């Protein structure tokens, strides 16, 4: 007998009912706000993610399912949905502003644990081509409405990571800070100082927490225009 692949799951009975219920709620909610659903391919070019996520990111270096097809092209099973939506927009609707929703399977080679799989579903909404505050508020409101419709106990936190230039300056400051304190960081975080600095802030490793708590704040590196918009 051949077993299912490690890190995957079968949806049947109550599980598939819950899945279809969540998907239906999601699609109806975002459609009511003008988001158009796009069905994306599970297979993408590897370069799409090395360029968007970063070739040194943990997803690219450790988690992507990648292979070479018979034509010699480097392909991957998509690890997340945002890059695929942006690829679709730039390929077919580049000069327009559009609102997209997506719901589909993603793949990451991680250690399977409770409620965490190597093949999993991700839902998302992307707003491309507009900078006005109203659109941001609408996206936040639609997300709140969707989660609320599932009767979940959740807390909505709103953040800003600034502009590209502001973020670049902040990452530079963070690198210097973490490099100065690397003797007190976990091995995993030390490895991310150069390649994926911001991800250190997500660490739950006990020895990292105090260093992270004292790290510089991005709010100190935002321009007045960004702060006012936020």
Give each language-model segment a name:
Residues 1-230:
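TRNA-recognition modules of translation machinery and tRNA-sensing kinases, especially anticodon-binding
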